[in-house]
Amino acid sequence: MCNTPTYCDLGKAAKDVFNKGYGFGMVKIDLRTKSCSGVEFSTSGHAYTDTGKASGNLETKYKICDHGLTFTQKWNTDNTLGTEISLENKLAEGLKLTLDTIFVPNTGKKSGKLKASYKRECFSIGSNVDIDFAGPTIYGWAVLALEGWLAGYQMSFDTAKSKLSQNNFALGYKAADFQLHTHVNDGTEFGGSIYQKVNEKIETSINLAWTAGSNNTRFGIAAKYKLDCRTSLSAKVNNASLIGLGYTQTLRPGVKLTLSALIDGKNFSAGGHKVGLGFELEA
């Protein structure tokens, strides 16, 4: 069993209630399909309603399951090319090794990362290293799990400056229908979240964050309600009086529609509200 989350996935259930089912100020189309030879294709396009700017990306993925290899190619409209090669569960159960490279043809810029992660039932660890001869940055994280309790640490070290550039701690508790997550980033940013699955139809989440030396406290409440197996409603509000509403409908198997709106509660009659439209297609 390798079910201990990574550091970035701590508190993920609460984040999903706040983030999924919304797409304010944009029209978005996602398409996923798989060829007969096993190559997975996914493409996404965005058009922002306030600026009119459009962007998109294409990703292809091919897995050689017998050898634990996955090859991924990425391209976006900024003309950035990415290649990722990963080896998983072959050298050891729960071990994943990845080489991730990026190339920008317009400028000739090249960059890359070496990644390694290892997951077991009671812990998970990982490290990334930038491929930079001027002085790579080393990233590392670790999560320990014991009887539902989770403790995590995340750091990054800039070898060129011999300086610790990131120093984060997290502590949480995870049960079947309840999750608690707290974190401290660089000793100055504090935050916490609570996730509660009330029943099979209702999920709720609370998020709180503040910065030391500042009166800027951020607080939000979010909920998701499943009307049936095809339809769900989402809503959230924060202490800045920004109200988010979302509606998701599965029109048919493989076709999903998302409508969302962001309302400024302090300036309701002044306009400036945002709406969003999203399509997800899978074949």
Curated annotation (Swiss-Prot):
UniProtKB keywords: Acetylation, Ion transport, Isopeptide bond, Membrane, Mitochondrion, Mitochondrion outer membrane, NAD, Nucleotide-binding, Phosphoprotein, Porin, Transmembrane, Transmembrane beta strand, Transport, Ubl conjugation
The PTM Phosphothreonine maps to 4
The record's CDD domains line, in alphabetical order, gives: Porin3_VDAC
- Where does the record place the modification N-acetylcysteine? 2
Q: Where in the cell is it found?
A: Mitochondrion outer membrane; Membrane
What processing steps or modifications follow its translation?
Answer: Ubiquitinated by PRKN during mitophagy, leading to its degradation and enhancement of mitophagy. Deubiquitinated by USP30.
Segments passing through the bilayer: 26-35, 39-47, 54-64, 69-76, 80-89, 95-104, 111-120, 123-130, 137-145, 150-158, 163-175, 178-185, 189-198, 202-211, 218-227, 231-238, 242-251, 254-263, 273-282
Question: What residues bear N6-acetyllysine in this entry?
Answer: 12, 15, 20, 90, 266
Binding locations of NAD(+): 242-244, 260-264
The main location is: mitochondrion
Per its record, the protein catalyses: chloride(in) = chloride(out); K(+)(in) = K(+)(out)
Q: Name one Pfam family in it.
A: Porin_3
- PANTHER family cross-referenced by the UniProt entry: VOLTAGE-DEPENDENT ANION-SELECTIVE CHANNEL, VOLTAGE-DEPENDENT ANION-SELECTIVE CHANNEL PROTEIN 3
Subunit and interaction comment: Interacts with ARMC12 in a TBC1D21-dependent manner. Interacts with MISFA.
Task: Cite the domain annotation text.
Answer: Consists mainly of a membrane-spanning beta-barrel formed by 19 beta-strands.
Stated name of the protein:
Non-selective voltage-gated ion channel VDAC3
Q: Which organism is it from?
A: Sus scrofa (Pig)
Q: What is the lineage of its organism?
A: Eukaryota, Metazoa, Chordata, Craniata, Vertebrata
Q: Which gene encodes it?
A: VDAC3
